[in-house]
C-alpha cells in the first residue's frame, strides 16, 4: 500500500499571507451565505467569521457582478479570499484581476485548453493558487460510467486528471478537495488522495446537514481523516450560520491538539453531587474564552470530587460547591471564592494568564528579531 503523505510533508502553497501545507498549521475555512455582489452584506459576514476565528473565506461567483465586487470586498477584509468559479473562465479572470487570493475551479470543466491556459497564466502572474474541487456528487460522466457509481478510486482519478491539466501547463500551486456527503466514502477518498499525490488537501464533508446532525457527521468523518495526519485546511459544512461552522472547526482542531491559538474548556458531566448551576456557568465560560487566542485550558467542575485533581492539566479552573468554590491552577487550590463571584474571579484569572502568554510571545518575537 502506498504511503500516506502526512500533512507536514505536503507542498507549501501561498494563499494571501498564509502558507498552506508543509509544516504549517491546519487552517479553518468557511463560506459566505450572501450574494457576493452585495458588498456591504458580504463584508459584514466575513468580519463576523474573522472574529469567530475563520482564517480563509470563500465566496460564490456565479455572475459577472459578483466577480466585479471582489476588489471592493478585498479592501475591507483581513483574511485571504477564495473565489468559487464554475464553468465560466472569464469570471475567474475577473476575480483574479480583482485580487482573489485563491481560485476554486476544476480546469476540466471550463472548456477548451486555451481557456485553461488563460486562467493559469493569470494565476501565475499574480501568484494565486488553484483549488481543484472534486465532489462525489458531480464526477465526470466517463468516470461514473467506468466505476458505476461514485467511488474513492473514481474521485482520485478525477483529481489526478485535473492535476495533470495544470501540471502540463507547469502550474503547481495546487490545493485539492475530495468531498462527499457519505462519511466512509470521504475517509477512503482522502486517504487514497494522500497516497496518490503530495499537494495540500482541503477537508470537508459536503451536505453534512443541520447544526446538530452536521456537527456530529463532520466530526466523525473529518476526525477520522485528521487522525491519519491528513488535511491542511478544513471547512465544516452546515445548514446554519457560517459562524457555527467556524466554532465547530475550532473545537475539532482543539480536540486533536492542532489549534495553538485557542482556549479550551474542560467541564464535567452533571450528576447528583452538583450544587451549582454547572450548565449555565460552563456555557458562560465557554462563550467568554471563545475569542481568546491563547492556548489555555480552562476547567469548570461541579464539585470538589472532580476538582481540582481530575483537571490537573487545566491552567485555571473552578470547582463549585454550595455557597463557595475552589479556584485552582494546575491541579492546586489557589483560594476559596464566594459562589456569587467565582465566575467573575475565574474570568479575571483567565485574562491574566492570556496577558502573560501574549507578553511572552511578544518577547520571543523581539528576541528572534534581534538574532
Swiss-Prot record:
Manner of cofactor binding, per the entry note: Binds 1 [4Fe-4S] cluster.
InterPro entries for this protein: Dihydropteroate_synth-like_sf (IPR011005), IspG_bac (IPR016425), IspG_bac-typ (IPR004588), NO2/SO3_Rdtase_4Fe4S_sf (IPR045854)
Chain residues that bind [4Fe-4S] cluster: 268, 271, 303, 310
One example GO MF annotation: 4 iron, 4 sulfur cluster binding
Reaction(s) the record says it catalyses: (2E)-4-hydroxy-3-methylbut-2-enyl diphosphate + oxidized [flavodoxin] + H2O + 2 H(+) = 2-C-methyl-D-erythritol 2,4-cyclic diphosphate + reduced [flavodoxin]
Pathway the protein acts in: Isoprenoid biosynthesis; isopentenyl diphosphate biosynthesis via DXP pathway; isopentenyl diphosphate from 1-deoxy-D-xylulose 5-phosphate: step 5/6
Domain of life where this protein originates: Bacteria
Protein name: 4-hydroxy-3-methylbut-2-en-1-yl diphosphate synthase (flavodoxin)
Naturally occurring in which organism (per UniProt): Macrococcus caseolyticus (strain JCSC5402) (Macrococcoides caseolyticum)
One Pfam family here: GcpE
Top EC class of this enzyme: oxidoreductase
Family of the protein in this entry: Belongs to the IspG family.
Cofactors required: [4Fe-4S] cluster
Protein's job: Converts 2C-methyl-D-erythritol 2,4-cyclodiphosphate (ME-2,4cPP) into 1-hydroxy-2-methyl-2-(E)-butenyl 4-diphosphate.
Disulphide connectivity of cysteines: none
GO biological processes: isopentenyl diphosphate biosynthetic process, methylerythritol 4-phosphate pathway; terpenoid biosynthetic process
EC number: 1.17.7.3
Assigned keywords, A-Z: 4Fe-4S, Iron, Iron-sulfur, Isoprene biosynthesis, Metal-binding, Oxidoreductase
Amino acid at each position: 500500500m502506498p504511503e500516506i503523505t502526512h500533512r507536514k510533508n505536503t507542498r507549501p502553497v501561498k494563499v494571501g499571507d498564509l502558507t498552506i501545507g508543509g509544516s504549517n498549521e491546519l487552517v479553518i475555512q468557511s463560506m459566505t451565505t450572501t450574494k457576493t455582489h452585495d458588498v456591504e452584506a458580504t463584508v459584514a459576514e466575513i468580519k463576523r467569521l474573522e472574529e469567530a476565528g475563520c482564517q480563509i473565506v470563500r465566496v460564490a461567483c456565479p455572475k459577472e457582478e459578483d466577480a466585479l465586487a471582489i476588489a471592493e470586498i478585498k479592501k475591507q477584509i483581513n483574511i485571504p479570499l477564495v473565489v468559487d468559479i464554475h464553468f465560466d473562465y472569464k469570471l475567474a479572470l475577473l476575480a483574479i484581476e480583482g485580487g482573489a487570493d485563491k481560485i476554486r475551479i476544476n480546469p476540466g470543466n471550463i472548456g477548451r485548453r486555451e481557456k485553461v491556459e488563460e486562467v493559469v497564466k493569470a494565476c501565475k502572474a499574480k501568484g494565486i493558487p488553484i483549488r481543484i474541487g472534486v465532489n462525489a456528487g458531480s464526477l465526470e460522466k466517463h468516470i461514473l460510467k467506468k466505476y458505476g457509481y461514485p467511488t474513492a478510486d473514481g474521485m482520485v482519478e478525477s483529481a489526478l486528471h485535473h492535476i495533470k491539466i495544470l501540471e502540463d501547463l507547469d502550474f503547481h500551486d495546487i490545493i485539492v478537495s475530495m468531498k462527499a456527503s457519505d462519511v466512509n466514502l470521504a475517509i477512503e477518498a482522502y486517504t487514497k488522495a494522500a497516497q496518490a499525490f503530495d499537494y495540500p488537501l482541503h477537508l470537508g464533508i459536503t451536505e453534512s446537514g443541520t447544526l446538530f446532525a452536521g456537527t456530529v457527521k463532520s466530526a466523525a468523518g473529518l476526525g477520522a481523516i485528521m487522525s491519519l495526519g491528513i488535511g491542511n485546511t478544513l471547512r465544516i459544512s452546515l445548514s446554519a450560520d457560517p459562524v457555527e461552522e467556524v466554532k465547530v472547526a475550532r473545537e475539532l482542531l482543539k480536540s486533536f491538539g492542532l489549534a495553538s491559538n485557542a482556549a479550551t474548556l474542560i467541564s464535567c458531566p452533571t450528576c447528583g453531587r452538583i450544587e451549582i448551576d454547572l450548565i449555565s456557568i460552563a456555557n458562560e465560560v465557554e462563550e467568554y474564552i471563545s475569542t481568546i487566542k491563547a492556548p489555555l485550558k480552562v476547567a469548570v467542575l461541579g464539585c470538589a470530587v472532580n476538582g481540582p485533581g481530575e483537571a490537573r492539566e487545566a491552567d485555571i479552573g473552578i470547582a463549585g460547591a454550595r455557597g463557595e468554590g475552589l479556584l485552582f491552577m494546575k491541579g492546586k487550590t489557589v483560594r476559596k471564592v464566594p459562589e456569587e463571584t467565582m465566575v467573575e474571579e475565574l474570568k479575571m484569572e483567565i485574562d491574566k494568564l492570556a496577558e502573560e502568554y501574549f507578553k511572552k510571545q511578544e518577547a520571543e518575537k523581539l528576541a528572534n528579531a534581534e538574532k
